């Protein structure tokens, strides 16, 4: 189970931060109920997302940042693909309960079927990448703050097994369209992986081959 969990978590950490969250300028959201209602409305209207991403990973043991870039794809209801292009080719695809990784031209497919922890982690990843908190399920504590330009959602797993892999996550949503601008995942209090998304496209057709997990 641990091996599968590590592979699934690599959807967020595969090759290698955006700088660790600096919450200066953020305060409690004025009306959290209204925010959640609007977020639900916005995310429910999205059927697919394509974006460019820059990932930066920091591990305190190495005291350095490793940077990578690629393309992100998401399609309703539960298909995700991270296609890393630099500095090394790497691809991870999650579709339903199947996970496929391609590294150095070699593909590996595993099944997470019937594993509750895998379901929970997969839901968490989908929620964080898309901003759809309703996809997250139970077992997570959330804190919502805002600045002039964006919303900040901090997610803290309450399940200790999940916390062994994810200490907390921060999602930065653009106030203009409620899309994810930045995502920071903390493995612990010092090590983290961050993503910045750009060139976002919504509700455009994505070739089925992108999510092929055969």
Q: What is each residue range found by the language model?
A:
Residues 1-4:
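Positively charged n-region of N-terminal signal peptides that target proteins for export
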Residues 7-16:
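Bacterial N-terminal signal peptides
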Residues 18-21:
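Boundary at the C-terminal end of the N-terminal hydrophobic targeting segment
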Residues 23-28, 40-45, 52, 57-58, ...:
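Flexible, processing/modification-adjacent segments and terminal tails
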Residues 32-58, 71-73, 81, 89-91:
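N-terminal secretory signal peptides
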Residues 62-66, 71-76, 80-86, 91-94, ...:
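Structural recognition of beta-strand segments within beta-rich domains
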Residues 110, 133-214:
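Gly/Pro-enriched, hydrophobic low-complexity segments
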